[in-house]
């Protein structure tokens, strides 16, 4: 796996981490050229999902943990947009790749453009959301026991995936509540 930071564009320009990811990609592409081996290079956006380590490298994990445990969260800019890949969607893509059916793409800056002969691979389902949208959803989830209002959570939606993630951080005493 690689990272969107390998683009070395925008906020990633000049990043040593991004440079190392790009060099790693090139090593795999060279190996494929020399040996004919199939190589699947993925540039993952921000990953999130159940039981991810909070206060490490995932704002979603930190926010879910903190809201579920009545800890403060800090959002410097509610309009900051993240591209997120849910861990279950990543696993589905990895299984497709293992079966010889990765989703091939090329990149238009940071956006995958899916095409049969693409140099890269990408999970077809990601979600672009703002920090403010994430926090607002988490606050609705937290209020559910008090309001008894189940938020609208369509199957396959970002809200459904975030709700599943949030529930994984709830202490067991908060999972049960009176009706």
What is each of the regions a protein language model found here?
Residues 1-10, 16, 47-51:
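Conserved catalytic-site region of short-chain dehydrogenase/reductase
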Residues 2-3, 43-44, 125:
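A secondary-structure boundary/capping signal
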Residues 14-45, 59-69:
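Active-site Tyr-X1-5-Lys
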Residues 26-27, 62, 89, 93, ...:
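Alpha-helical elements of Rossmann-like donor-binding domains used by nucleotide-donor carbohydrate transfer enzymes
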Residues 41, 84, 128:
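Short aromatic/basic micro-patch
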Residues 45-46, 65-85, 105, 114-123:
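A conserved pocket-lining segment of Rossmann-fold NAD(P)-dependent short-chain dehydrogenase/reductase
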Residues 54-62, 79-99:
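Substrate-positioning beta->alpha
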Residues 96-179:
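Mid/C-terminal beta-alpha module of Rossmann-like enzyme folds, strongest
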